[in-house]
Amino acid sequence: FGLVASFLWIFAAIYSVGYMRGNKEKNQTRFYAFYAMAVHAALCIAYADDLLTLFIFYEVLTFSTYPLVTHKQNEMAQKAGRLYMSILVGSSVILLLPAIVWVWVATGSLEMSQNGVLDGKIDVAYAPLLLAMFVFGIGKAALMPIHKWLPAAMVAPTPVSALLHAVAVVKAGVFTMLIVLTNVFGIDFLAKTGASEWLIWLASFTLLATSIIAIYKDDLKARLAYSTISQLSYITLGGALATSMATQAVSYTHLRAHETSRY
């Protein structure tokens, strides 16, 4: 994720310069500053070693992309920005942060491991609840019903759409989801407890529903947004299956392929 994002950012940045100058957009310096900050936050998420660092830069990414979403400063952009912040900040503060605190209380650490850290540290009966807090706390993964921020954010300038779809935002969300499934819960723990079975159904429903919605959208950006949500759900589904083959397939193949195609 980090390598692909840093590579695609080069082309996205070059395009954004031409777009901003060609359309004579206002506040270009502010735009470039927050654009660079967003990519930096995404890379910090990619290389985070613990949940605290992950959460901090997850929030930095949210706040740095808000001025980009609302760049046009019209009523539609402001409305989209309010929805963007309310869903992403609300979900992370209300659900993601308490979930991280729960992990810290249970394990005594915020470090992550390739085999997970919760096996033997948490009551199996509470594992689905903790997973649900993580899943719905990671609003950037855009699972239903917390997906509406992405179609709304398409009012942003085209370079921001590339940032949202390919370079940083949604990929940071689904990458965080995979990290939680593999490095916090662990594939073996999920398979043994069945804690992610409900997530399989949710991801499957999301990918089917949003694919159908995308077909009936005439606006190209709206169709792209719902198509992106569908593809993100494929990645989440692969992680929720709790097998090494599925996890490797979505992390090494589908995640990178979707980043490149959306760009």
Language-model segment annotations:
Residues E59:
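Short phosphate-coordinating micro-motif centered on Lys-Gly-acidic
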Residues L8:
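Active-site-adjacent substrate/metal-binding segments within catalytic domains
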Residues G2-A5:
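Predominantly extracellular/luminal regions of secreted and cell-surface proteins
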